[in-house]
Amino acid sequence: MDESKKISLGQFFTPTHIVKYMIGLMTKNKNASILEPSSGNGVFLDSLIQLGYTNLTSYEIDGDIISHPFVINSSFITSYDKPQYDSIIGNPPYVRWKNLSELQKKELKDNSIWKMYCNSLCDYFYIFIIKSILQLKVGGELIFICPDYFFSTKNAEGLRKFLINNGSFEKIILFNESKVFHGVSSSVVIFKYIKGKNIDNINIINIDSKSPIKSEDIESLGESYYIPRFSSSDVWVTSPNHIKVALDKFESYCKTIKKVQPKSLFDDLEFSRIGSVCDIGNGMVSGLDKAFQMNDINYSELELLNSICVAKAKHLDAFCFSGYTRYKFILDDINEDKLITYFPNFFYEFNNYKDYLLKRYSYNKYLPYWKWAFLRNFSLFSKNEKKIFVPCKERISKKSNFRFSLVDEFIYPTQDVTALYKKENVKESIEYITAYLNSKAVFLWMKYKGVVKGNVVEFSEKPLANIPFRRIDWQLKSEKKIHDDITNLVRKYLSNKEFSILHEINLNLEKLGIKVEI
């Protein structure tokens, strides 16, 4: 199979035992009208036919992989949205916008549904879900297997709102890190959704195993429980209800008074969030780190002046960081002759990687091989103050804390790190904010309500900005004292690394309600 076609069409075919399980979720009779909107190699069709279903329709844009009397070899995206099917089942293509062909991108740009609910940050499978629901009869069932990140990502809010407004989920199977497809690392779910029906509770099957799924007896592999139906387009929490209650209690301590109008009797409460106390930015992009990293040689004074200290994810730990790497960093506009004259060691080292450097993504601008590809948030990172670094992604399957590190002045992050700088006029100390972010409460909140793909938590700007934050009531001497104690304890820990201090920090955080009791 052509690899570029496989990527642009999202051709990852479903194992037969998974198909049989999904068909087993169907409740319609053998004469029901059934659609498979992306047939792929026909595994769903073959299984449905073997089981006696006869009223079948399927779409497959790639005529090279299947020719079948039930298959329409054209794009499902352009099909007519008439409610006509009793059941829709399948494995929609998962393709990020950048991997779509130009023809596919044009098709989406011209599509009214895509323009209403999606954008170029969305995955291709989003529109398959929406169009499938539009083509279901009221009471019809949609059974799909797809990535789980539409439960939590910001770009899927439109999809989540559409799903809430047009029906409800009956069952969701969470595979987490279990391997379902060969060569696919994304965490996937199977869901059953009923159009136009209000189902009060969703049956969750939560499979907590890294082993490959080899049997259609899927429900015996995980924990089964029920949660209330989703009621908003915010992040969908699929954990048991007692965890949701504990998270709600923690969030209640992060609420502050919101003035509706001067002297109003109807003041409301709203969450204070990290985004209200910190400026947040993802790190800069060199495009080829090994070419910019400096070696143990005698660089000239000018070369050293044109370098920066970089802390990468590998340098970060909870509260502290273990070091940095010096990188070449020429800001001035020079030509190659001046590079050779004034930066001879840089030129020699760059020359070893020149072919690769010239092939970097240029962000639609002229990019000399000795320049960084994208100085994202450079002005923020140049502030002369301490800040907090965190890896952009963190696998948490065997961890109980994150790595929010308090980092010294004039150390810069690259693209595998996100930085948080305290906003001006925020009274809480950077040490207090660091302690808060490293708390068990924030770990659990991000685990269940953050942007999580499988067991990997994302720490880009928007997910970080959304974390509830416990502000200090400066009118209360008791809270001010706790804040000051935490600040001093963090400084003490950074000085001597005594683990007993971390326990003291946590005890003080708990006095402010910064805990999740599960």
UniProtKB/Swiss-Prot annotation:
Family indicated by similarity: Belongs to the N(4)/N(6)-methyltransferase family.
EC number of the protein: 2.1.1.72
Keyword match Iron-sulfur: no
Xref: Pfam families: Eco57I, N6_Mtase
Molecular-function GO terms, alphabetical: DNA binding; N-methyltransferase activity; site-specific DNA-methyltransferase (adenine-specific) activity
PANTHER family, alphabetized: DNA METHYLTRANSFERASE YEEA-RELATED, TYPE II METHYLTRANSFERASE M.HINDII
Catalytic activity entry: a 2'-deoxyadenosine in DNA + S-adenosyl-L-methionine = an N(6)-methyl-2'-deoxyadenosine in DNA + S-adenosyl-L-homocysteine + H(+)
Origin species: Haemophilus influenzae (strain ATCC 51907 / DSM 11121 / KW20 / Rd)
InterPro entries (alphabetical): DNA_methylase_A-5 (IPR003356), DNA_methylase_N6_adenine_CS (IPR002052), MethylTrfase_TaqI-like_dom (IPR011639), N4_N6_ade-DNA_methylase (IPR050953), SAM-dependent_MTases_sf (IPR029063)
One GO BP: methylation
Keyword NADP among record annotations: no
Keywords: DNA-binding, Methyltransferase, Restriction system, S-adenosyl-L-methionine, Transferase
Protein name (database record): Type II methyltransferase M.HindII
